[in-house]
Structures are given as structure tokens and as C-alpha cells.
């Protein structure tokens, strides 16, 4: 059979008309430029915001800018081998990280890859890093405490499970120290901790991990690290990855605590990415959605109801509420809390712990300014005994700070004012605390009880801390039953109050401090 040329051309035409275009063509694009980890891609007509893109060499990126004729994406990891003309494919997937108990005790990067040299993580599940926060209907009010073991926080700015409490202050004021003490104090308290290090020196992160290992805290802690040497994309994603790991426990009726150290550096990383993507800059050159950057992260910290947990686990876990407590850290410049990012995060969170350089340099550590530090919801979660005893402390300190300012100009003070100043000096001294030495509830209760009932008033200021330490040792050896009752009931009954008074008086008489 012979075909003439016209028949051949007709055959080809009919084949072309009947050809179904492959979907792959729509899902492939070409790299048109690579600069500072930002890639412009032409030809990706079927791509979602936040979708993972596959580059040559098993490298992945994240689609962030969807424009009319191109897509702006950020590369996750090394990008030296990517060049103009490379083929990019869509994956149809959103970025996910491994989750589950297998991560506990490990140090991972922002994508959940282990970086501690202890082998693979072997997590059975993965979950999306961007998730919608639980709705109002699924939330419960905060009612259980997170004991940080830090006297001034547990007494004056208590934190509850499911709360967001900001730690804010200049550099070198002890922000990380407060966060680490909170983690160390969770030993045996059935609370999983996640520490997210963003933009810190690798040596600083190593010191944190070493300290957590020394104190046995790595047994219930996950460390997510995006150091200063990592790309801006990794620093931007690390908090979301850590939050997803924490949500795994929250949604299964457990309690978790996450620390973001610090969100200022995440905002810087996001600003860098946005400017490279040519997004219009706003105040302080941040993009317009920098508030949403932090609000969508911190809204995921919540106390969820028993119904939510039961629904999420398909009835496997019943009668248990879960919580994710967030302690975001923000670094200020020269104490300026009116800057863009600090004001944003203050408005999102349920209170703030303000650390001051002047107090830190004066030797008052932790350097917490009691006047401007607040906890908007934690009061409901405070243990009974601490709530009963801490009211007077805050008042004493506030009055002391006010009077101390006037006392500088007054030559002769009346007896009541002088007494108030003396009490304030002793309370300030009492609230000093060495790092890595968090206190149990009974220890805090005894310290507050001593201050409230005037047992410190006749001591020299330098004797306050030795007296407190000696009293604790004395109670441990001679009144173990009293300690146990306070620790178990988290309350101070009339009988126990009388016993504690007698114990303190006998210790004072002994002078063993």
C-alpha cells in the first residue's frame, strides 16, 4: 500500500488534533534567574502558593510569589548547582516535617533532618508545617500552671498551659536563660518541650544542647535549629516546623511547651526573602504581612478541649484536653518596645516578661521588671499556695520602686516609708536566683511566706539569700512531712501555716545561716 504525500499530511494533522496535552507540561517550568537563594521560574502554570517545587539534584524549593508570567520561589538548602535553563517540576504537595515521639531527645534542622550525628529519626508520621489554628469553639480557658521554677515569674507573672507569654528584652539580658530554666524545671511534670533556635551562632546552640543533656532535660525535649549560617528560608521556616512538632502532642491530649528563640531573627529572615522577591517594603522595610507572619504562628498555641482531642484521634483518646504553650522571645534595640516587631508580638501574646539591661547590670538576675511585666490569663492557672502568698510581693515591689525614686530627693523619711523601703530591698534580694536552679512549688511558697510575714525584715540584705537557702535545707531535714503536704496539695492549710511559722522561728533562733 502506497500513501501519497497529501494523505500523510492529513494523517499527521488528524493525529495532532486528537492529541491530548500531557498535564506534565503545565507542571514544568524553566529557571530564568537564580540570586541569593531566590529563583524565578517561567512556565509553571499550575502551582499553589507554598507548594514544594522539585529542582535538579534532589533539591526542593517553596513557591512564594505567583505572578502573571513567572513564579518566585525560595530554595531550601544549597543552590550553587542550580543554573538558568534548569527544569523545575511541581510536586502537588505542601512542605511537611516529621512528627512524633521519635523526635524527642534529638536535634533537627528546619526540615526535620537530624543534625546531631545520632542516625536517622525514623518518625512514622509527617505533617504540614502551615496549619490553621484551632477555632474558638474547640478551645478551653487556661487553668493549669506551667511552673518555670523562677521565683519572680511564678509569683508575679504566672504562665498557664496553652498561654502565649512573650519574653522581651535587649541582647544579653538573660532571655534564653529564663527559657532554659523553664525547660529544665519540667522534669517529671509530663510536659514535652521544644526549643527552636533561630539565627543563633552554632556554638550557642551547642551550649544549649549540652546544658539540656547535663540536666537530663533532653529526655523530654526536641531542639529545632536554624543557625546563623543557615539560609534565610530555613530561619523563616524553623518556628513553623517546631510548632507542627508541638501540635502532634497537643492534638493527642498531651501538654507541650515551645520556645521560639528568637522571633526577631525570623522577622529579619522573612524581610530578607520578601525584599529579594521584590515585594513592596513597608515600615522598617518589613513586608506588609509581617504581623500575619507571627500571628498565624502564635495562634496555634492553645489549650484544646476534650471534644477536639477525641475528634482528632477518632475516639482513641477520650476525656483528655491538650495544650501547646508558647514562649516567644523578642530582642529589642536599646529597650525600644515601640519598634514594629515588638509591638506586633506584644499585641498577639497573652502577656510579656520584660527584662531590663539596668537591672541585669545591677546584679538583679533574672532582670525582670515587675512593673511592666504582665500575664493576662496566667492568674487563673496559678497554684493555690502561690496565689495566696504572692499578692503582697507584687504590691511591696511596686511601692518600693515608687518610694525609691522619691527617697533619692528626701533627706528625712518617716518610719512607715523607711520600713517600706527596707522591705522592698529584701524582697528584691529574695527574687534573685542563680541560673539552672529552678525551684519547686514548696520552696517558692516558703520564700514568699517568709517575706510576707516579716521574717526577713530584721535580716541584713546580704543575709537574705543565705537565710532562704539555709531554711530550705532545714525544712528538708527536719520537716519533710510538711514539705510533702505543701507539694502534694499545692495549698497551705491553717495547721500547716502554724507549723511553718514555728519551723521558721526555730530556724531563726538557731542562727544557722
Swiss-Prot record:
<dbReference type="GO" id="GO:0005524">
    <property type="term" value="F:ATP binding"/>
</dbReference>
<comment type="function">
    <text>Produces ATP from ADP in the presence of a proton gradient across the membrane. The alpha chain is a regulatory subunit.</text>
</comment>
<dbReference type="InterPro" id="IPR000793">
    <property type="entry name" value="ATP_synth_asu_C"/>
</dbReference>
<dbReference type="InterPro" id="IPR036121">
    <property type="entry name" value="ATPase_F1/V1/A1_a/bsu_N_sf"/>
</dbReference>
<keyword id="KW-0066">ATP synthesis</keyword>
<dbReference type="GO" id="GO:0045259">
    <property type="term" value="C:proton-transporting ATP synthase complex"/>
</dbReference>
<keyword id="KW-0547">Nucleotide-binding</keyword>
<dbReference type="GO" id="GO:0046933">
    <property type="term" value="F:proton-transporting ATP synthase activity, rotational mechanism"/>
</dbReference>
<dbReference type="InterPro" id="IPR027417">
    <property type="entry name" value="P-loop_NTPase"/>
</dbReference>
<dbReference type="InterPro" id="IPR023366">
    <property type="entry name" value="ATP_synth_asu-like_sf"/>
</dbReference>
<keyword id="KW-0472">Membrane</keyword>
<protein>
    <recommendedName>
        <fullName>ATP synthase subunit alpha</fullName>
        <ecNumber>7.1.2.2</ecNumber>
    </recommendedName>
</protein>
<comment type="similarity">
    <text>Belongs to the ATPase alpha/beta chains family.</text>
</comment>
<dbReference type="InterPro" id="IPR020003">
    <property type="entry name" value="ATPase_a/bsu_AS"/>
</dbReference>
<comment type="subunit">
    <text>F-type ATPases have 2 components, CF(1) - the catalytic core - and CF(0) - the membrane proton channel. CF(1) has five subunits: alpha(3), beta(3), gamma(1), delta(1), epsilon(1). CF(0) has three main subunits: a(1), b(2) and c(9-12). The alpha and beta chains form an alternating ring which encloses part of the gamma chain. CF(1) is attached to CF(0) by a central stalk formed by the gamma and epsilon chains, while a peripheral stalk is formed by the delta and b chains.</text>
</comment>
<feature type="binding site">
    <location>
        <begin position="169"/>
        <end position="176"/>
    </location>
    <ligand>
        <name>ATP</name>
    </ligand>
</feature>
<dbReference type="Pfam" id="PF00306">
    <property type="entry name" value="ATP-synt_ab_C"/>
</dbReference>
<keyword id="KW-0375">Hydrogen ion transport</keyword>
<dbReference type="GO" id="GO:0043531">
    <property type="term" value="F:ADP binding"/>
</dbReference>
<dbReference type="InterPro" id="IPR033732">
    <property type="entry name" value="ATP_synth_F1_a_nt-bd_dom"/>
</dbReference>
<dbReference type="Pfam" id="PF02874">
    <property type="entry name" value="ATP-synt_ab_N"/>
</dbReference>
<keyword id="KW-0813">Transport</keyword>
<keyword id="KW-0067">ATP-binding</keyword>
<dbReference type="Pfam" id="PF00006">
    <property type="entry name" value="ATP-synt_ab"/>
</dbReference>
<keyword id="KW-0139">CF(1)</keyword>
<dbReference type="InterPro" id="IPR000194">
    <property type="entry name" value="ATPase_F1/V1/A1_a/bsu_nucl-bd"/>
</dbReference>
<feature type="site" description="Required for activity">
    <location>
        <position position="373"/>
    </location>
</feature>
<keyword id="KW-0997">Cell inner membrane</keyword>
<dbReference type="InterPro" id="IPR038376">
    <property type="entry name" value="ATP_synth_asu_C_sf"/>
</dbReference>
<dbReference type="InterPro" id="IPR005294">
    <property type="entry name" value="ATP_synth_F1_asu"/>
</dbReference>
<keyword id="KW-0406">Ion transport</keyword>
<keyword id="KW-1003">Cell membrane</keyword>
<dbReference type="InterPro" id="IPR004100">
    <property type="entry name" value="ATPase_F1/V1/A1_a/bsu_N"/>
</dbReference>
<keyword id="KW-1278">Translocase</keyword>
<dbReference type="GO" id="GO:0005886">
    <property type="term" value="C:plasma membrane"/>
</dbReference>
Amino acid at each position: 500500500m502506497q500513501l501519497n504525500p497529501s494523505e500523510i499530511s492529513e494523517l499527521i494533522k488528524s493525529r495532532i488534533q486528537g492529541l491530548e496535552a500531557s498535564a506534565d507540561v503545565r507542571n514544568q517550568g524553566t529557571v530564568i534567574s537564580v540570586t541569593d537563594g531566590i529563583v524565578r521560574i517561567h512556565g509553571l502554570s499550575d502551582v499553589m502558593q507554598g507548594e514544594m517545587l522539585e529542582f535538579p539534584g534532589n533539591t526542593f524549593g517553596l513557591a512564594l510569589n505567583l505572578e502573571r508570567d513567572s513564579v518566585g520561589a525560595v530554595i531550601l538548602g544549597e543552590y550553587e548547582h542550580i543554573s538558568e535553563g534548569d527544569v523545575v517540576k511541581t510536586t502537588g504537595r505542601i512542605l511537611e516535617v516529621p512528627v512524633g515521639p521519635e523526635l524527642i531527645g534529638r536535634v533537627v534542622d528546619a526540615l526535620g533532618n537530624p543534625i546531631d550525628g545520632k542516625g536517622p529519626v525514623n518518625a512514622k508520621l509527617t505533617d504540614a508545617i502551615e496549619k490553621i489554628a484551632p477555632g474558638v469553639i474547640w478551645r478551653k480557658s487556661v487553668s493549669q500552671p506551667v511552673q518555670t521554677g523562677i521565683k519572680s515569674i511564678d509569683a508575679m507573672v504566672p504562665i498557664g498551659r496553652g498561654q502565649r507569654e512573650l519574653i522581651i528584652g535587649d541582647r544579653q539580658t538573660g532571655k534564653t536563660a529564663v527559657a532554659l530554666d523553664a525547660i529544665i524545671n519540667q522534669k517529671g511534670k509530663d510536659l514535652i518541650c521544644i526549643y527552636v533556635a533561630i539565627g543563633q551562632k552554632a556554638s550557642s546552640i551547642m551550649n544549649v544542647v549540652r546544658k539540656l543533656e547535663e540536666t537530663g532535660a533532653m529526655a523530654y525535649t526536641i531542639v529545632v535549629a536554624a543557625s546563623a549560617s543557615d539560609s534565610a528560608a530555613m530561619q523563616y521556616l524553623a518556628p513553623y516546623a517546631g510548632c507542627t512538632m508541638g501540635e502532634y502532642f497537643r492534638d493527642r491530649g498531651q501538654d507541650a511547651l515551645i520556645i521560639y528563640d528568637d522571633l526577631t531573627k525570623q522577622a529579619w529572615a522573612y524581610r530578607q526573602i520578601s525584599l529579594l522577591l521584590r515585594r513592596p517594603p513597608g515600615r522598617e522595610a518589613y513586608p506588609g504581612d509581617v504581623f500575619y507572619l507571627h500571628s498565624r504562628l502564635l495562634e496555634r498555641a492553645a489549650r484544646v478541649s476534650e471534644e477536639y482531642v477525641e475528634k482528632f484521634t477518632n475516639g482513641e483518646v477520650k476525656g483528655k484536653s491538650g495544650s501547646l504553650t508558647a514562649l516567644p522571645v523578642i530582642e529589642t534595640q536599646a529597650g525600644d518596645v515601640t519598634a514594629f516587631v515588638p509591638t506586633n508580638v506584644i499585641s498577639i501574646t497573652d502577656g510579656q516578661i520584660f527584662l531590663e539591661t539596668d537591672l541585669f547590670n545591677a546584679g538583679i538576675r533574672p532582670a525582670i521588671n515587675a512593673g511592666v511585666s504582665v500575664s493576662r490569663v496566667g492568674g487563673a492557672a496559678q497554684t493555690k499556695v502561690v496565689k495566696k502568698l504572692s499578692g503582697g510581693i507584687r504590691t511591696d515591689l511596686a511601692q518600693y520602686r515608687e518610694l525609691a525614686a522619691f527617697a533619692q530627693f528626701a533627706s528625712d523619711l518617716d518610719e512607715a516609708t523607711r520600713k517600706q523601703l527596707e522591705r522592698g530591698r529584701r524582697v528584691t534580694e529574695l527574687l534573685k536566683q542563680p541560673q539552672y536552679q529552678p525551684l519547686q512549688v514548696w520552696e517558692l511558697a516558703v520564700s514568699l511566706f517568709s517575706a510576707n510575714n516579716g521574717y526577713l525584715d530584721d535580716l541584713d540584705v546580704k543575709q537574705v539569700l543565705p537565710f532562704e537557702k539555709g531554711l530550705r535545707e532545714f525544712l528538708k531535714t527536719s520537716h519533710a512531712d510538711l514539705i510533702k503536704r505543701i507539694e502534694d496539695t499545692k495549698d497551705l492549710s491553717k495547721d500547716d501555716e502554724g507549723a511553718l511559722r514555728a519551723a521558721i522561728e526555730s530556724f531563726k533562733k538557731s542562727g544557722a545561716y
